[in-house]
Amino acid sequence: MMFPSIAHISSLALLSTSVLSQRTVVPAHFDGTEQSHTQWISNATGFDAPMNQPLNDTSFDWWYFDVVQEPDAQGQDHPSFAMTFHTTGADGMDVFQNLFPLGLPSNLLIQINLNWPDGGKDAWVLAGDEGVITVEGDGASGDFRGTGCAFEGEADLSEYVVYVDAPEKGIVGTFRVKSDVPPHYPCGPAEAGQDMQVVPGVGWMNAIPDGYGEADFTIRGKPFSVRGRGYHDHNYGSRPFSQSAYSAYWGHGRLGEYAIVWLTVLTPTLEEHVSAYVTKGTEIVVARCGGITIRPYGAHSTYPPTRRTGAPEGFTISVDTPEGLFELQAETINTQINFDFYRRFTGRFTGTLDGEPLPDGVALWEQFALDKDE
């Protein structure tokens, strides 16, 4: 079976030279030696478009989606779902070499990870035959042919829908996220002329920093659903990822009327780059590259992290804003991914604003550790 929206995406005939309508085709395998142009300064439109034209051996674009359940009365129900659509050259997302030491099966890879309500994990990696990325307005849609997977974005970034039709892999269903807050770049709002680099060589744009998410899947005949806080962003790079990042912490969560996205990256020379985003209701409080400190706490909280560090108990996030000082804590309940070089967590999100308690919430966050130690 093919979802109607996937067929619609596949049938779009768009001009590759147009800013408003763009179509990019990525084959499963390509030579990769061609010179690539990477865009670092934002345009007035095309927010979620591919930023490498064409993709080559050292470049990458990925589109990421997640949702984590808002906790029940006991605060223990944290199922979650996350999915990433990767287009990458053989050396672009070089961290994949940890998983595929003999080489990538395709330049089009899809990762699906989830936690069941009891904390149990499931994971899939799917290799595509061809990727077709189309752009209308600010939104992007992608059909990763040969996987049964696609995503479809509204031109105004108000909503994204992800489709999975892979019964032979034991998973069929959809994920939908509707935005509640404005999009942003690392250092400012979504407007023309913004620097999209979060560190030299890696760009980031956050189309849906926080929204209402719904995931409904059938997994090996068993229903799986999540209702909670959803998210979508897009990363890209012009060189192997580990040449730009030594370690990184990123996450997002909501506390009452405040939505927060945090990011810190250390370069291989240990220069720290940060990004802070806070909204109150639908208004941006801060969107900037400063005023934030993110650190692990508890056991295994070595900073900067290494591949031998292990999983920390959680993270503290301090954000200085015009609203006041946010002192936040993300406490791990479930681990969604647990490799030595990459870990992803969900759990309780708590904190204060100028010392006054905020309503408890939920968050999802990650840790990269890309040192060369074995």
Give residue spans per PLM region:
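Fungal secretory targeting signals
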Residues: 1-21
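Structured soluble/peripheral alpha/beta segments that form catalytic or ligand/cofactor-binding pockets
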Residues: 21-374
